Amino acid sequence: MSPEAPIASPPDCALSNPSVKDARRGHGLVRWVPETWFGHWFLGTNVWSRYAVEVALNDLARLMPDSARRPLRILDAGSGPGVSLPLLDRIFSPESILAIDINPKEVQRSGRQAGLCRCEVEVRAGDATELDLPDGSVDMVLCHQLLHHLVPQKEALAEFHRVLAPGGTLLLAESCDEFISSIPVRMLFRHPNETQRSATGYQRLVRDAGFILAPDCVETSTPFWSLPDWGLRQKLGWKRPAGAEPTEVAGAAMKPWE
């Protein structure tokens, strides 16, 4: 999710990173941070679509709990350029997908991807923290690389919990603070650094929102594209230190059955 951020009252934390000062409006703080031109460009690359989105969705499908509701109605929250839409259609065979993004330009890009889907797809502009959807109206929410762009993360998760039907699934994949705080990412992208979390922190956030996230439904990883050297040293035989923080976390959480 990207540009022209709406205004909000100051959240729980302050945005002190110089890279986001230009995202302030008036006396309030933005609810999310607009992406850089490089970030927009990167979302259109093969690295993003193949190694970030496709790999994540296949992993998330594998992590889904057996007791979860069948995902007939899917919400893709923060759909960006929409490369996830054909993948959601192929992997889960839903009846319908609703894709939302706060950036109208990304909505246009998602609309082009919607034409590649077999199921019914609606693409619209929307705010993940204020979803214009009835309670219990979707069976699955995809939240892929969205929360680390948001300041009101708890509000977004509360909305996902509200619109999910009992037994519905939240598919969450996030880049962790270990990656977001690295020098290359800080130079090329823009994020609200004060709200970044570790893999453990994201898992706690999801559970605190009322979701069930079983240990066997979550994984952490450090893919090559999340390393400063893009994995070159690993190809030469270097091994990451034991206990090093992962850069990515993926989990399939479930809203409890009532």
Show where each model-derived region lies:
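Conserved catalytic loop of SAM-dependent methyltransferase domains
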Residues: 215-249
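Class I SAM-dependent methyltransferase SAM/SAH-binding core
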Residues: 75, 81-129
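Short alpha-helix
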Residues: 195-210
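Short conserved loop adjoining the S-adenosyl-L-methionine
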Residues: 130-135
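A short glycine-rich, Lys/Arg-flanked "PGG" loop and its adjoining helix->strand segment in the class I
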Residues: 154-166
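A conserved beta-strand element that flanks and buttresses the S-adenosyl-L-methionine
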Residues: 142
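Conserved class I S-adenosyl-L-methionine
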Residues: 4-68, 87, 171-193
